[in-house]
Design a protein with these regions (language model features):
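Hydrophobic/aromatic-rich alpha-helical bundle segments in the mid-to-C-terminal region
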Residues: 144, 152, 166-215, 225
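C-terminal alpha-helix
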Residues: 161, 216-224
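Short hydrophobic clusters on alpha-helical segments that form packing/core surfaces
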Residues: 31-39, 116, 217
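Helix-turn-helix
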Residues: 30, 38-72, 76-77
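Hydrophobic alpha-helical connector segments
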Residues: 89-126, 180
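N-terminal intrinsically disordered/low-complexity leader segments
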Residues: 1-26, 92-96, 224-226
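Generic hydrophobic, amphipathic alpha-helix propensity
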Residues: 26-35, 52, 77-81, 85, ...
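Amphipathic alpha-helical packing segments from all-alpha helical-bundle domains
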Residues: 107, 118-133, 140-167, 208
């Protein structure tokens, strides 16, 4: 989490009294951090722009100059969570493609599956997913954003990873994105639904399912021996 921002009156200012780029970025991060917490604690309907401004220590005109309404603020929170979700997927894909001696597919997918479950079941992720679900009919564009920029970009990113493995001869797949979609659903399906519905996850059962999901996927994509 970002550190508590300085009040606007004491923040360092650039030429002409305007916030420096660094200070503006810190303030932006603080606003998104506070908004995330309030949306999680109070839900979409229970959170107001005024409450976010007060908790973040910024003036209402400052907040409204950046976000015209609550929907725009929620979109910023959603984009922030999407970046966190995509970061480890992108890193895994890039590392696999750039390695002179690629890591074994089983090792990479085992590590990735662990990371996926941790992030997918984080309280912040689960709570925001509930908010999106509750507001899907009222704000269908936000639901589409979560699906297209979150899930589908995740699928494409894992698809790049699997594509690199295929080029290295470690696996055989016809369509990397279809394979990625199947992998993500195998690994995350049951556990993410339990977290979404507030059902306690049995850690031992989840770990058993995770290992089985990776093994089942690999069994279907390993090249046939000559």
């Amino acid at each position: 989490m970002a550190a508590t921002a300085e009040p606007e009156s004491t923040a360092k200012r650039g030429t002409g009294g305007r916030p420096t780029r660094e200070e503006a970025a810190r303030r932006e991060a603080r606003i998104v951090e506070v908004a995330t917490r309030l949306f999680i604690e109070r839900g979409f309907d229970g959170t107001s722009i005024d409450a976010v401004a007060e908790a973040a220590g910024v003036s209402k005109p400052t907040l409204y100059s950046r976000y015209q309404d609550k929907r725009a603020l929620f979109e910023a929170v959603l984009q922030d969570r999407i970046r966190e979700w995509l970061a480890p997927l992108s890193a895994a894909a890039e590392m696999q493609a750039l390695r002179a001696t690629p890591k074994d597919a089983a090792t990479v997918l085992d590590e990735l599956s662990r990371n996926l479950l941790v992030r997918a079941q984080a309280p912040e992720t689960t709570a925001l997913t509930r908010c999106i679900t509750a507001q899907a009919l009222q704000f269908p564009d936000l639901a589409r954003l979560a699906y297209e920029e979150g899930w589908l970009r995740g699928v494409r990113t894992v698809g790049r990873l699997l594509g690199a493995m295929a080029e290295q001869g470690q696996i055989t797949i016809d369509d990397p994105e279809i394979a990625a979609d199947l992998f993500l659903n195998l690994v995350m399906g049951r556990s993410s639904k339990q977290a979404l519905y507030g059902i306690e996850v049995d850690v031992e059962v989840q770990e058993k399912r995770r290992r089985a999901a990776v093994a089942l996927f690999l069994a279907g994509v390993r090249p046939n021996p000559a």
